[in-house]
């Protein structure tokens, strides 16, 4: 391919919608997405009358393969990008572990009505039974209606026989832990946790897997209760993160203490607090072996050095609008990728550094990457070096380890600077 030696760049993808009985129209109305579905040999443009339950922004799932929508690699799919550019996309450590499989999926969920109750397998079970990844997922609440509800696990320990009976007679809600979410809440859904939702728009960050099983469908659809029965955790649900309280290994959901954490000190521990950050810093939402996610309130430009992360980065715009700005290939001018509300952009690991500049007030982004599981240092959202410059760092001390790199260390000409919007 003629472009194999060209520098990669921030990439946006054509969103892939999924029509669902329980879906709504928020993707089209509130978030302004332009969505199409196959209709014979043609495509049909979706309207506000269509019920879009899911919308995949970044996915390498085989049956869903995101197509790049900008730049010189536009028109190619994410799997083609991976097969061509390998570790230049994901980073060397991620490539050594995942190969040409892109490791993370980003999608939106619009549950205007009640979703079916589901459960996800863990990685070991999924590998043994289905030769696939399991599914750990983060839900971030982008919008919540007056009747919003999340159904996460059980209110108290239940017996398998009671659960089975109530799934079959339609009264399973009596057993479930019900959370009344508000905009900005986040929840880590671990394998084995039964889950559903109603009246919310969610951003879901997950492993590259859609392997899940329907336990109860309020619309009378097919279920896989028997196949998934031994996957279910029948204990009471706890939203408390593992890293903050120390008794749930490897998982973090730093906002879980607002919704039923049983630890009295939760919210006072240094990991539960949004510690040392200001409106420009990355606030940890989740850290687990499969991915890491942070929320960024973007009031001022941020300069991010990708080499400190060692992996790709993904940004999803929940509110406002931003511009990702990189140096051109000759290093003498600025190239921009505008990120509007409801859009997602992938920054390949090869991109040395870039600026994120707000184009609107109250801009809020979700930043997704990979945890450096081989590094014992877990500062700044799970990374040894968080990648943000001094203004955006959320270390307790407010400073980074060491000095910022010189411009030419990252191949950026000293004359390149970001465009600031007034």
Predicted regions and their residues:
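Ligand-binding loop in jelly-roll beta-barrel domains
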Residues: 101, 109-114, 123, 144-147, ...
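Histidine-centered metal-binding segments
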Residues: 240-277, 377-408
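Short acidic-glycine-tyrosine-enriched beta hairpin
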Residues: 176-188, 196-197, 327-351
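Short beta-strand/loop turn elements enriched in aromatics
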Residues: 141-163, 282-285, 300-313
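Short beta-strand segments in beta-sandwich/barrel cores
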Residues: 303-304, 320-326
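His/acidic/aromatic-lined binding-pocket segments of jelly-roll/cupin-type domains
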Residues: 106, 115, 137-140, 178-179, ...
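Double-stranded beta-helix
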Residues: 152-174, 203-242, 366-382, 409-422
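Transition-metal
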Residues: 1-158, 219-250, 273, 293
